[in-house]
Design a protein with these regions (language model features):
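Sequence/structural signature of small/polar-enriched beta-strand/turn repeats
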Residues: 1-237
Length: 237
């Protein structure tokens, strides 16, 4: 049923099978208490918001009409965990900035970062990446096989890892920051379109790379590239 809420300072310790199956994709369940998933959690239909944090060694799955949302608190997905849900969202619907540390398998169709900090510390893959806020962090490589959209307000990519846009890149956020030693790659043969906003490579070591045979289009008045980082053009600019 829509609007179910689990509240409090206690813990939901799932070692079995936890299923969320609501009437339609717009209905929501909010878990504001802690939740540890060491079994399986399957969001079949609707939105499951995890806002109380937790430590996870189990699996997260989900259907095409479902969203698994890390909406607050500190979540640690250990090396033995897996996220293969269709749609995953990182937000700040609940109190606190929120941090999600992903050290296990991550292979999903769509990833959306609205707020929160998503730390990808192992090789990860998503079909689509949309970042309109928040921070993409971590030490691993996140490979986007479809469209990468960096849009909306201010947002950050940081850490020592790599974000590979291997299916096209659209950049039109207000302030798009690459920090620390993060590298954003426009993959070989792909097209990047920077149509709005300010791109900031803020520190030495932060890199935007346009690979060989890739095309990087800059259009629109007032585009600004700032900072002490590097634009490494190996393709067509």
């Amino acid at each position: 049923g829509d609007g179910r809420t689990l509240q409090g300072n206690g813990l939901f310790d799932n070692q079995g099978n936890l299923v969320v199956n609501l009437s339609d994709s717009t209905q929501e369940v909010d878990v504001d208490a802690g939740l540890d998933n060491d079994g399986s959690l399957d969001v079949q239909t609707g939105v499951l918001r995890l806002g109380g944090g937790g430590t996870h060694d189990g699996g997260f799955t989900g259907g095409a009409n479902a969203v698994l949302e890390f909406s607050g608190g500190s979540h640690t997905l250990n090396a033995g965990s897996s996220v293969t849900a269709t749609n995953v969202r990182f937000s700040a619907q609940d109190a606190g900035a929120g941090n999600t540390f992903i050290d296990g398998t991550y292979d999903v169709a769509s990833t959306e970062i609205e707020a929160n900090t998503a730390h990808f510390n192992a090789a990860a893959q998503t079909g689509i990446l949309t970042q309109s806020g928040g921070t993409l962090d971590g030490t691993g490589t996140l490979t986007v096989t479809g469209q990468t959209s960096w849009t909306g307000g201010s947002s950050v990519m940081e850490g020592t890892g790599i974000t590979r846009a291997d299916g096209g890149l659209q950049m039109d956020g207000s302030f798009m920051d690459i920090q620390e030693s993060r590298t954003l790659v426009n993959g070989a043969g792909q097209t990047a379109n920077w149509t709005a906003g300010t791109l900031r490579l803020l520190v030495a070591g932060s890199t935007l790379q346009n690979e060989a045979t890739a095309l990087f289009n800059i259009s629109g008045d007032g585009r600004t590239l700032q900072g002490n980082g590097l634009f490494d053009n190996q393709g067509n600019l």
